[in-house]
Amino acid sequence: MTLSAWIILVTLAMASVLTPEDNVRLRRLTAYVANADASIVLLTYTEYEEGTNHGNSMLWRINDPLEAEYPFDPDDISLLNAERVCPELVGVGDLQYSTHNQAFYFTAQGPDGTSQVYSYNHKLETCTQISFLPISVSNLKVSPKGNSVLFSAEIFVYPNNHASVDDPLNFAHDEFARIQARPYKAFAYEQLYTRHWDEDILPSQYRHLFAARLERSSEYDDDYVRITVDNSIDLMPRFDGDCPMRPFADASSYTFDSHGRYVAFVTQVGSTAAFYTNDSIWITDLQQFLDAKKPVRDVVLPLRCATCWNKARDQRPAFSYDGIFLYYASMDEEQSESDLLRLRKQNVSDLFEYDCDSLFCGPVTGEGVFNLTAGVFDRSIGQFIIPTDSTEDSIYILAEDHARTNLFRYNEESSTVTRLTYNGTLGSLLYLRHNKIFLATMSSYTRPTDLVMLDLTVATEFTATRDPSDTMKDDLIKISYLTDLNRQRLRHIDELQEPEEFYLPSKSFPDQYVHSWYFAPANLRDSHEYPLILYVHGGPESPWANSWSYRWNPQLIAARGYGVLATNFHGSSSFGEVFQKSVRGNWYSYPLEDIMDAWSNIYTHADKAYLSREKVCAMGASFGATFMNYMNSHVNNVTCYVTHDGVFDTMCNALETDELFFPVRELGGFLLDEQVDNQQLYEKWNPARFVENMSAPMLVIHGQKDYRIQVYHGISLFQALRLRGIKTKLVYFPTQSHWVWQPQESLFWHTQVFDWLDTYL
């Protein structure tokens, strides 16, 4: 038995530590919504059946959560005053509340297996199906007046087939059935994408945004609202584009104005989304649709493009309360997914005065556009909320900051930004206007996602600086937990350790600091030596953030008796624009320098004398795996590697990857531009070019459904190592994508990784 194996056995025997089995059993909060005063909260969470990949999405109701006291009774189900709602429904999501209608709305699987719209009457405690559409719908959003809804659906757009435009929902139902019944499975493509992330996209298949009226009809004996094809309309007819954009955009891609008349939505037209990031915001006027007699699908609505003047990405549209201004998050760089998103404001009151027939009708320049956060906020804008009742001129923003996602207040009058939170990662803000309170989701390295309340009435002032020594370490508003979903599932765990974090001065950039997290091995024993794991994140423009992970969770590695060093090297987001963009064209130079510096420094910590200098393994996924493939040929004192879904050949990947724009920004231009310097940069950072220098054992992991980095990269790397006599193993997932997301597959992943680490460390 090796020393490392003995340490692991002792570690597991001494105390109950987090295991992969524990992690996949956790309840995963997926959505929530509250009524106006938060006296009722509906939420859904998913938990997986033991030994399967089948997850159940359950709907719960919490009464008066703001009046509860924390901590909770350990004998309850870790939900305050909670009760299960409509347990017969499965696949629940897209939770909405209409103040006007005093009703909740959501999507769930209907009797025919499609996802349909339901309403929940909280007084009668009944759920009622209200949409009867031929295909599934998702990304539900209810208008402020409660008289209409928005939803998305997968349809087909054939330019020469009028039925696909005139009756898109019924046509899509029939077309999916026709394709399924064909005796062959082949397709012919003329447009990009052919596939995206892990999805095979059919020719001419698009995700379109629809509006439907919420109205009661005298055609039926009951008093139920019904959504049908007769009162639904495609808001982007003939568009060869998606809304929400694939693969991860959601209902934040569109919004109503405060009166429910105008809708702003994000899409990209022209089948160029694989090579360009020109996602723009269109606005349409629903008035004719709301006034028309049924059927309404023949109504032609006016469309104007508010931001087609900007050739970069625009996201998250939101109207001012008076409807005069459109706020949105926007990038400046074309063909970029990692530019900072800045908050912009644009007058759209005269948008429909533009008289033109072009689909792109609208402003042709950015004249009159206000760049609100440019020059005053060196972070990328995430979700933002404009309180309609605020006496202050404030906008509340979620943004990545110092490896967290924090809440900020932006004062439009003074152009100042105040950080309000610091601990953990926030998401899914919901503003309760009468209470000056936010609800939000929150997680950290020590706690899976729960629902929290953010009380703005106790906020104090703090303005952040770039100097990490001045970084605020405490929240400036009161944060209270409203749920503790996994108390029972984690109660046997002795401790989830709070990681140490430290900054080191950058060797290449004066006045910059490089941040690292460190997780100590669980159950440390005096006089024992423990191996070290170098944890390398993907992106490269993303950080190791203080949030819970169901996949690459450093707590699981530390629980096995390994120290874990996770460095946020140059390129990591949340540390400012200059720091983030420095990785472009420098894929391994600055990151390797930062990682090596943190690695060397960790041994100078007097309290870490237990760390081995000889037993060190490096592991990473995506860009982190690409980094592993390069590092193995350039660093000779790493014992072993784990590389998950990484690029082996940058030249091939430039034309294989689904998002063709990605290497354009990262590596200085498109591979086929015939720029000699550009091609040399692709070759400079090409791991395949240095394969003859690889020597350390390498565990290669790849998913067949990974369309970001094709499976051939993993197979090629594995075969190259084998042919060179280097110890290696290929772990192949036929059903997984860029991520291993199914619980049983994840357990197998962890078994293989732990076996590899235990063998070589």
From Swiss-Prot:
The keyword Disulfide bond does not apply. Residues 1-15 form the signal peptide. It is an enzyme of class 3 (hydrolase). Its main location: membrane. Disulfide bonds: none annotated. Induction: Expression increased in response to the protease inhibitor bestatin. Its EC number is 3.4.14.-. GO terms for molecular function: aminopeptidase activity; serine-type endopeptidase activity. GO terms for cellular component: membrane. It comes from the Eukaryota. One of its GO terms (biological process) is proteolysis. Transmembrane segments: none annotated. Gene3D superfamilies: alpha/beta hydrolase. The active site is at S622, D706, H738. Pfam families: Peptidase_S9 (PF00326). It is found in: Membrane. InterPro entries: AB_hydrolase_fold (IPR029058), Peptidase_S9_cat (IPR001375). Keywords: Aminopeptidase, Hydrolase, Membrane, Protease, Signal. May be involved in metabolism of dipeptides or may affect host defense mechanisms. PANTHER family: DIPEPTIDYL-PEPTIDASE 5, SERINE PEPTIDASE S9 FAMILY MEMBER. Belongs to the peptidase S9C family. This is Dipeptidyl-peptidase 4. It comes from Giardia intestinalis. The lineage of its organism: Eukaryota, Metamonada, Diplomonadida, Hexamitidae, Giardiinae. The gene is DPP.
